[in-house]
C-alpha cells in the first residue's frame, strides 16, 4: 500500500479532511454525515459517518477510469476489493461497469 493510501485510511478512520497530490477526502456539501473521496476531482467513494459501518464506503465508483491508481485508492478502503481481469472490473468478486456507483456491502456474499 502506498504512503498516501496509509494517510488516507487514517483520515477516513478519524473523519478528518485530507488532501494530498491528486486525492481528497472531504465532507459532502449540504450534509452532516456524508463524506466523499475524490481522485483528480472525480468522486470515487461515498461514506456515511452515522452509518452502521462508517469506515466502509456506502458506494464506490471507478468514475469511468479503470486505472491502476483508481483501483489502488479504492483497494485501500475497508470492505473494498477491486480487481480487473481481461479489462473487466470486479468489485468484491462481482463484475461491475467502469461507470456507475456500486455498494460494496450489497455485493458481499
Whereabouts are the PLM-identified features?
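Terminal leader/tail segments of proteins
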Residues: 1-109
Amino acid at each position: 500500500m502506498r504512503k498516501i493510501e496509509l494517510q488516507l485510511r487514517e483520515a477516513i478512520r478519524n473523519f478528518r479532511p485530507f488532501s494530498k497530490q491528486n486525492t481528497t477526502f472531504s465532507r459532502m456539501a449540504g450534509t452532516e454525515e456524508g463524506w466523499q473521496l475524490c481522485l483528480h476531482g472525480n468522486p470515487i467513494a461515498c461514506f456515511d459517518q452515522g452509518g452502521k459501518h462508517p469506515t466502509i464506503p456506502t458506494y464506490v465508483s471507478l468514475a469511468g477510469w479503470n486505472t491502476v491508481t483508481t483501483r489502488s485508492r479504492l483497494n485501500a478502503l475497508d470492505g473494498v476489493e477491486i480487481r480487473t481481469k481481461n479489462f473487466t472490473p470486479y468489485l468484491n468478486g462481482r463484475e461491475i461497469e467502469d461507470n456507475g456507483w456500486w455498494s460494496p456491502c450489497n455485493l458481499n456474499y
